[in-house]
Amino acid sequence: MAIHLYKTSTPSTRNGAVGSQVKSNPRNNLIYGQRHCGKGRNARGIITVRHRGGGHKRLYRKIDFRRNEKDISGKIVTIEYDPNRNAYICLIHYGDGEKRYILHPRGAIIGDTIVSGTEVPISMGNALPLTDMPLGTAIHNIEITLGKGGQLARAAGAVAKLIAKEGKSATLKLPSGEVRLISKNCSATVGQVGNVGVNQKSLGRAGSKRWLGKRPVVRGVVMNPVDHPHGGGEGRAPIGRKKPTTPWGYPALGRRSRKRNKYSDSLILRRRSK
């Protein structure tokens, strides 16, 4: 993705950087609306996730994470913007008339052909089981549970690496640095997710952040004691504690929050680096 820098004509464009525009013209049978989605509220209207609300209305695109059109070649017809994720999506026309969206692999262009199955070429955009891939293959959209669809390495620029195969399991190095075991029968897509330069974008102004449905974040140290454990004091006072905490008094910034004795602990060979 090309990054375009703004000229400093207004304060909001100063040091601004945006990606190249990709239009979106979704198919009606592959989209549907979502009511009360992304506002950070539960069914009772109570805030359960802070700093969310507003934003532009969105239509959800049905993405084919399972890639279960086996041994049927498909052609990339469009590359579109998806407001629900930072990666682009591709519209695929399969030979049997089926039309589906998939994540856009890096380097894929309109007119390329992809296929999924057990004995397919190791080329960008093709989906196949891990047992049929050579070591060192760069992959994304990786299944954890067989047949459930890809759940790992789906963000823009994400890529994992197949580093070993032994017995019924394959060893993967994930984008976070975590090394874990996954069944060799699980499927993955060859290549890296596109839109790699998304982290180089600079929104430039607060309004652009609000369009994304993200509200302002207020520091706890400037609140009152009734609102946050860090609040209170005269002037610019420190937090008054040995370690920072969340608004509800739980340890923050470094405390491990993963549950103990989780079923997947035995599958993680090396934890992600912080």
UniProtKB/Swiss-Prot annotation:
GO biological-process terms attached to the record: mitochondrial translation
Pfam hit, one: Ribosomal_L2_C
GO molecular function, one term: rRNA binding
Keyword Nucleotide-binding: no
Cellular localization per UniProt: Plastid, Chloroplast
Gene Ontology cellular component annotations, sorted alphabetically: chloroplast; mitochondrial large ribosomal subunit
Keyword Chloroplast: yes
Disulphide-bonded residues: none
Alphabetical list of HAMAP family matching this protein: Ribosomal_uL2_B
Entry protein name: Large ribosomal subunit protein uL2cz/uL2cy
Species per Swiss-Prot/TrEMBL record: Ranunculus macranthus
Gene symbol of the encoding locus: rpl2-A
